[in-house]
A protein has these predicted regions:
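Short N-terminal "domain-start" leader segments
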Residues: 1-29
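Mixed-charge, Lys/Arg-enriched low-complexity segments
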Residues: 3, 32-64
Length: 64
């Protein structure tokens, strides 16, 4: 089973964290649609969320 969490920051960036039993991947776009992080693997969801914090801005989950 894959869990998908969508995020948006106050500076216009969007992100998706996809997690399964085997991996956690992070995908981030800036406000212009340019890819910043393209499916980079992380050891866990917390590590991926920490990577979002390092990009700056206030991140919140969004419903899709």
């Amino acid at each position: 089973m894959v869990s998908i969490i969508n995020y948006k920051s106050d500076n216009g960036m969007t992100a998706v964290i996809k997690s399964s039993h085997y991996s956690v991947m992070l995908y981030v776009k800036d406000k212009d649609g340019n890819i910043i992080i393209d499916n980079k693997p992380y050891s866990g969801v917390i590590s991926a969320k920490n990577a979002l914090r390092k990009l700056g801005g206030n991140w919140e989950t969004i419903e899709e």
